């Protein structure tokens, strides 16, 4: 068969008040290389032992749900996306599985279909839509209907502060309230609206202000990520636009002027020595498929 490789970017979700809606693709990647057919699915990887190497692997199980008639293959998976750190590792695996089914099953899925399927699996469009489309996305899931808008944000730099500790998404969601008072919802929604408008109009200072005024989730998750306020304060002093939890955490996501990202990252690394400080870029390509040769990490 023609060698096939799939590359899926990481993502950050929410960007503060854009809860389960706003996502940004990042320059960390999951790679899947499809090898020969086999009598059963085999996943070659060097991750921790808890990650399955058979058809229970999230990439393979997703692919088989999308196209149950797929012939088993041996696939090799590599990734520099940290697991359970709020950088879309599970979303990237779901997106990779959909593309694996699309390629091997010759499904000819459209971009919109991929986003719809991925959102149905994930439950919200922010991470998966960003990984599929690249750039910054704003999405909404209403019942089974998904609407997504993509915008460019090439003037922005990204820094991620990644702790050593993991934080399971289910655990992080468990601290959120079941009921949100109407007046709080109005306030939180207005802030989110201004965030999206500022992203579209490239008013980065306003973006930074809004992403630090979330009411939907960050106030409830602070107990799980206690360093967020001090990181936010330092990042602002160093010249960043704004700081927020990356997805459900525990990683911290910072938007900066593109030309200042390295300087700000170096300053933060000197202060927060217990965390891994990554200077990243926004990925503008989204998922890519290479049928000729695989370029590894």
Curated annotation (Swiss-Prot):
Gene Ontology CC terms: cytoplasm
Pathway given in the UniProt record: Amino-acid biosynthesis; L-threonine biosynthesis; L-threonine from L-aspartate: step 4/5
GO molecular function: ATP binding; homoserine kinase activity
Record Pfam families: GHMP_kinases_C, GHMP_kinases_N
Residues that bind ATP: 82-92
Keyword terms of this UniProt record: Amino-acid biosynthesis, ATP-binding, Cytoplasm, Kinase, Nucleotide-binding, Threonine biosynthesis, Transferase
The UniProt record lists the keyword Translocase: no
Catalyzed chemical reaction(s): L-homoserine + ATP = O-phospho-L-homoserine + ADP + H(+)
EC number: 2.7.1.39
Main location: cytoplasm
Recorded coiled-coil stretches: none
InterPro entries from the UniProt entry: GHMP_kinase_C_dom, GHMP_kinase_C_sf, GHMP_kinase_N_dom, GHMP_knse_ATP-bd_CS, Homoserine_kinase, Ribosomal_Su5_D2-typ_SF, Ribsml_uS5_D2-typ_fold_subgr
Single Gene Ontology BP annotation: threonine biosynthetic process
Transcription among keywords: no
Cellular compartment(s): Cytoplasm
Function statement: Catalyzes the ATP-dependent phosphorylation of L-homoserine to L-homoserine phosphate.
Family of the protein in this entry: Belongs to the GHMP kinase family. Homoserine kinase subfamily.
The protein's name: Homoserine kinase
Lineage: Bacteria, Bacillati, Bacillota, Bacilli, Bacillales
């Amino acid at each position: 068969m023609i060698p096939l490789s799939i590359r899926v970017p990481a993502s950050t979700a929410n960007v503060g008040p854009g809860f389960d809606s706003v996502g940004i693709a990042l320059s960390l990647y999951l790679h899947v290389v499809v090898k020969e057919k086999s009598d059963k699915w085999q996943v070659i990887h060097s991750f921790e032992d808890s990650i399955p190497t058979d058809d229970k692997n999230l990439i393979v199980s997703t692919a088989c749900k999308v196209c149950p008639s797929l012939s088993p293959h041996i696939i090799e998976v590599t990734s520099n996306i940290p697991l359970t750190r709020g950088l879309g590792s599970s979303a990237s695996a779901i997106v990779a599985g959909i593309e694996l089914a699309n390629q091997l099953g010759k499904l000819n899925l459209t971009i919109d279909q991929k986003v719809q399927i991925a959102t149905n699996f994930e439950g919200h469009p922010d991470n998966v839509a960003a990984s599929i489309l690249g750039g910054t996305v704003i999405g909404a899931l209403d019942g089974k209907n998904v609407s997504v808008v993509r915008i460019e944000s090439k003037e922005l730099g990204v820094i991620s502060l990644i702790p050593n500790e993991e934080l399971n998404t289910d655990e992080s969601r468990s601290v959120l309230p079941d009921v949100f008072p109407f007046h709080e919802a109005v306030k939180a929604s207005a802030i989110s609206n201004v965030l999206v408008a500022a992203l579209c109009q490239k008013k980065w200072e306003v973006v930074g202000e809004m992403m630090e005024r979330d009411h939907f989730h960050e106030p409830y998750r602070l107990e799980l990520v206690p360093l967020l306020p001090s990181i936010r304060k330092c990042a602002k002093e160093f010249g960043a636009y704004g700081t927020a939890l990356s997805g459900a955490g525990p990683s911290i996501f910072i938007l900066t002027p593109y030309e200042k990202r390295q300087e700000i990252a170096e300053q933060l690394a000197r202060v927060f020595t217990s965390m891994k400080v990554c200077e990243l870029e926004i990925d503008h390509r989204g998922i890519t498929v290479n049928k000729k040769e695989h370029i590894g990490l």
